[in-house]
Amino acid sequence: PKEVVYKKSSYDQSMINFSPPRKIYSPIIGVDLVRTGKDEFYVLEDNCRTPSGVSYMLENREIMMKMFPDLFHTNRVLRVDDYPTRLLQTLMSLAPKKCDSSIPTVVLLTPGHLNSAYYEHTFLSDQMGIEMVESQDLFVENDLLYMKTVDGPKKIDVVYRRIDDEFLDPLCFN
């Protein structure tokens, strides 16, 4: 019901009629499913804003495959170990068309080590081979986003934001 949507704190009326670049609204979504029967599933949570938990699934699968290899082979369980590669490909596909190089610079923006999903942030950035940055590592110059590095500023093409909306504004310390 629309009343439920309108009462949500994350509902932003200014987004009505907003058209994002290339009409890509949500390139990454997390959906938690619960199997309740042979052919019955329920959505426990769907998260478009900051999905998390995939690193635990990947680590769990790796351990389970080592412990029970026959179980996976016999039941033809699909592999998931290519998730970081596919995630990186998705992120790179979001780079602006006027990218300076053929390989876009992608970073993962984390709120820091106190965040409950920090392990996942480090895991994913490591698996994708990208830099993990915090807000203090970034600056804007001539309408372009840069990260500070030991070799000097490096332009960023894509930010994989793992930080909630309310923590984005550095002037509003929530």
Predicted regions and their residues:
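Domain-scale recognition of functional cores that engage charged ligands
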Residues: 1-174
